[in-house]
Amino acid sequence: MADDKTFPSTTRQLAVSLPAERTNVCVGADTYSIVLEGTDTDDKFSFMDMLIPPGGGPMPHAHECEEMFYVVEGEVAVFCHDRRTLATTGSAVNIPGWAPHVFHNLSTVPARLFCVVAAAGLEREFLEIGPRVATRTTPPPPVSSEKKAEMKKKMPEIAKKYNARILPPDTFNHLMSTEELKLVAAADGE
């Protein structure tokens, strides 16, 4: 037990993340800025700044880690198990480990989320699958339909490496209107 003058020893140093030094990666239509990686936090958590365009959001999935996000701007519809929740500016959401989920920006303006994943690791999956871009607001580069199809085939294997699973694309369709499904398909380039 540490007293006022001694503390348990650590070799870890202060981690500082400057905007110009961050890695920014595109996952589908979204752009994620990796603010803190697992290497910064002894793999306890990672922190990302996510820009989700209208219709954007990930594929339905589940992963071992807890995922929390805070909606800084805009709104996203969150689907978890059989529940749909609208998370608006100022809302915080926690998704338990291994809970099937997805979120989509079903509005007409971009949404910005701060996302914490504990334990870290999910950011490494994003870095493996997505192209790097210059800034957190840089839109994804154009991707051919062949490259998109190739990546969708690879995703389940890549996800497994990071203790995650990709779910069927229509997992949460029963909770969305026809117009919302069209918006999501358009963001995905379909």
Where is each model-derived feature located?
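A hydrophobic, small-residue-rich beta->alpha segment in the mid-to-C-terminal subdomain
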Residues: R124-S145
